[in-house]
A protein has these predicted regions:
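Bacterial N-terminal signal peptides that target proteins for export
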Residues: 1-8
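Cyclophilin-like peptidyl-prolyl cis-trans isomerases
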Residues: 13, 19-206
Length: 206
């Protein structure tokens, strides 16, 4: 389990484009600071099926705001869940365009206090062992991972529809290399791990 938890620390198939065309706004993280609503829903249309996440801002305000802005500006479109460990969690959130990932991978937000436990279906930003190291990667808990709470992993939302879809995400476990994802983006993942579940489109539901 120690090895699995350590792997949560970040180095921060269909014929589809290797990366979604980035919106110009994604090149300027400083402009994407809109405050999220108190609650909102995000629909992930994935290659495995639809998943709906309900976000509660009070649980983790900074995380909820970051997720809201990234979804609104198309960051997660085309993104793969590159690390899926059955019984633990499914992790994704590295942009398929290396230039965009380079910008956001070093644009961290401060930590939120942990108000909710990492229960099955809860959605959380990944982080390193250092303070204030959350950027864009998120994970969905497959199990009740309360041991993550004391490590500062603060859930900001939960899957309210489609958890059975999440359970079917393609699992290559720890095989994909985050360094190569950073360097090559979706081109690397599509070439070497073509069955990875990916987000076709992430949208904020009205």
């Amino acid at each position: 389990m120690t090895r699995v938890l350590t792997a949560l620390v970040l180095a921060a198939g269909l014929a589809i484009p290797t990366a979604a065309a980035a919106q110009p706004s994604l090149k300027n993280p400083a402009s994407l600071t809109e405050k999220a609503p108190a609650t909102y829903k995000v629909r992930l249309d994935t290659s495995s099926g639809p998943v709906v996440i309900q976000v509660t801002r009070d649980w983790a305000p900074l995380g909820a705001d970051r997720f809201y802005n990234l979804v609104k500006h198309g960051f997660y479109d085309g993104v793969r869940f590159f690390r899926v460990i059955p019984g633990f969690m499914a992790q994704g959130g590295m942009n398929g365009d290396p230039a965009i990932q380079k910008i956001w991978g070093r644009n961290n937000i401060n930590d939120d206090p942990v108000k909710q436990s990492n229960k099955r279906g809860f959605v959380t930003f990944a982080k390193t062992g250092a303070p204030n190291s959350r950027s864009t990667q998120i994970f969905i808990n497959y199990a009740n991972n309360a041991n993550l709470d004391a490590q500062g992993f603060a859930p900001f939302g939960e899957v309210i529809s489609g958890m059975e879809v999440v359970d079917k995400f393609e699992a290559y476990k720890n095989v994909p290399d985050q360094g190569l994802i950073t360097a090559e983006g979706n081109a690397y993942l599509q070439r070497d791990y073509p069955k990875l579940t990916f987000i076709k489109k992430a949208t904020i539901e009205k």
